[in-house]
Each structure stands twice: as C-alpha cells, then as structure tokens.
Amino acid sequence: MTARSRGRAVPSYKASLVRDGLKGTRIGILRQAYERTPPANNPSAVTVDPDIVKVFATAIDDLKSAGAEIVDPARVELPPAAQGGGCRGFKYDINDYLKTRGARAPVHTLDEIIASGKFHESIRGRLESSNRGTPQGPDSDACKADAAYRTAFGAAVTKTMDDLKLDAFVYPTWSFPPQLVGQTAQGSAGDNSQVYSPRSGFPAINVPMGFTRGNTLPAGMTMLGRAWSEAALIKLAYAYEQATRHRRPAPIR
C-alpha cells in the first residue's frame, strides 16, 4: 500500500474544507455493514441497538438536508472468504521487524516478548495465539490467498460504487453505544470498523452523528470511499460536521 501511494500525495487537505461539500453527491447506505443475522446459538440476540438505528436514521435525513442524494440500500456483492484459516502474519512481521533493530532492541522475537511479561495482561491470549505455529510471511500460501481476497474485496466495493455512481458509503461505526466504565456485558461486539475499510484497503473517516441514551452517549458514522479518495472523504465529513455540529466536548473534571 505504501509503495502504491507514490505519486498520489496531496499537498494540502485544506481545499477539502467546503461547507456545502455534500451538495450533489450520492451517498450509499451500506446496511450489510451493521444489519447482521443473530448467531444460530442465540437467535434472540440484539445485533444493533435501537438507539443507534434511530440516530443513524436521523443522520441519513441530515445528509439529505445537506444536499446529498441517498441510495438505500447500496449492497456490495462480496467475494467468498479466503480458504485455509487466513494469513497469520503477526509472528512473522514482529520477528522480522525486531531483526532490524539489532542489539538496540530489548527483545528480539515474539517468544521473548511473551517471556518478558512486559505487556498488559488483557492481550496475553492474543500474543500466545499469534505465537503458535510457523510464522507466515507474504510468500506463504495462506497470505497469498488473503492478499487475493483483499484485492477481490476492493474490486467488489469499487464495482458497487461505479454501478451506483456513489461518492461514498455510510454506516454506523459501532452498533452499540459506548460502554460505561466497569461495563463488560457487550464486550467488543458491534464494531463495524473491522471489515470494509481494512479488507479493501480503502480510506474511511468517522464523524459524530448524534447521541444515544437520552442524549448522553455519543454515536459515530463511518464514511467509506474509493481508493485514494481521502480528500473527497474529508470534504464530505467536513460538510456533514458543519451542518450538524454534533460534537460536544466532554466537561473537564
């Protein structure tokens, strides 16, 4: 991705700060990003909070009021998932990076990181899981299959945008309001930021879209664009932000 970005640098994003930047645009509602079927072992599970649904509906109306044409739904026909368990490249990548640090590094492998115990206990399970098995580099069959899947995923997103003449997709960033300190019931469920942008490699930007729980807990909306469309996304996000002014700084106590 870094190599492919050569020659695409934008000198300044200041020109993207246009208050009426949503006028004349076409925005697709990517409902499949957050409207999920409950798992078979828990068919009554709530997969998106009603407050989020309500706030997002208002956000769509706000986009319309700011001059955007809404395409709803805008569905992406995704490719079948890569087979073989996916690319488990973390162990390879971290060990390869630590080699470049030489004697300056206090640790030289993922094994040594785990043995040191110098990390937050909450990530121990992930570190140990990543350390199992043979490191998979970019030339491994699993990582090649994963790279091919990501390319196909990005092509599917682009095709939908081309077919529907979209400037961006939008969807709730999270399907649930923020948890309060000490709350653990929801865990990390409902994070909608881990699929469409990471798997396609395309840019996305998050903007405040309003409040839930009696106007107390914030909610965000993600705008997903084409490859290299950062300037266009900033223009859309800025126009939406200026039209709604949802951001409310928390009081300092």
Q: Where do the PLM segments sit?
A:
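Small-aliphatic-rich amphipathic alpha-helix that forms the alpha element of a beta-alpha
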Residues: 78, 184-208
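Short, surface-exposed loop/helix-turn segments at secondary-structure junctions
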Residues: 44-45, 141-142, 176-195
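General small-molecule cofactor/ligand-binding pocket signal
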Residues: 69-74, 205
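Short helix-loop capping/hinge segments that flank enzyme active sites or metal/cofactor-binding pockets
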Residues: 16-42, 88-158, 206-220
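Structural helix-boundary/capping segments
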Residues: 1-36, 45, 57, 62-64, ...
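Acidic helix-start/capping segments at beta-turn-to-alpha-helix junctions
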Residues: 74-87
